[in-house]
Amino acid sequence: MTALTRFAHSRSSWFLLTGTAIGLEAAALYFQYVMKLDPCVMCIYQRLAVFGILVAGLIGMTAPKYRLIRILGASCWAVSATWGLKLALALVNMQNNPSPFATCSFLPEFPTWMPLHEWFPAVMLPTGMCTDLPWRFMDVTMAEWMVVVFSTFLVIWLLFIVPILSGSTKPSLYK
């Protein structure tokens, strides 16, 4: 078993994924409440995608020695990172090519059975506009940084998918 496979089968790899997502969620709340940067609806959707990566890490952390658990975690990771990248690219396009006809909505379009913006308004209620560019770091906007973040999550997923899918050297039906 290679070192990468051993790491993918360990709790620490999934803990690292979870910790990274928690750090990103904490940074989002810092930007919102300390720096007073209002999140737009696309930002809220990206926040939800990061939460999906957090859930993926928690799934993988429960029992990383079992292939089925690793596959469930990796699937959630891939879907969330892909969806987040799609949203981040759409937001970058919206900010780089502003149009009065192509704006984002004021309220998120969550399912009626799961109105997260009503249940958790402090975290999931958008208060900003998608075309606002209030913050830059190294001349890169927050939306562009999120493209980097979600792309990195996907590249790491690509590096880990084969070790995640591989079984352990111990004979077992589930490993």
From Swiss-Prot:
UniProt keyword list:
Cell inner membrane, Cell membrane, Chaperone, Disulfide bond, Electron transport, Membrane, Oxidoreductase, Redox-active center, Transmembrane, Transmembrane helix, Transport
Report the locations given in the UniProt record: Cell inner membrane
Q: How does it sit in the membrane?
A: Multi-pass membrane protein
Membrane-crossing ranges are 14-30, 49-64, 72-89, 145-163
- Where on the tree of life does the source sit, at the highest rank? Bacteria
Q: Which InterPro entries match?
A: DiS_bond_form_DsbB/BdbC, Disulphide_bond_form_DsbB, DsbB, DsbB-like_sf
Residue intervals on the Periplasmic side? 31-48, 90-144
Which SUPFAM superfamilies does this chain map to? DsbB-like (SSF158442)
Q: Name one GO cellular component term.
A: plasma membrane
Q: Which cysteines are joined by disulfide bonds?
A: C40-C43, C104-C130
Q: Which GO terms describe its molecular function?
A: electron transfer activity; protein-disulfide reductase activity
According to its UniProt entry, the protein's GO biological process terms are: protein folding
The segments annotated as topological domain Cytoplasmic are 1-13, 65-71, 164-175
Q: What does this protein do?
A: Required for disulfide bond formation in some periplasmic proteins. Acts by oxidizing the DsbA protein.
Q: HAMAP family from the entry?
A: DsbB (MF_00286)
Record's PANTHER family? Answer: DISULFIDE BOND FORMATION PROTEIN B
Tell me which family the UniProt entry assigns to this protein.
Belongs to the DsbB family.
NCBIfam families given in the database record:
PRK01749.1
| Identification of the protein by name | Disulfide bond formation protein B
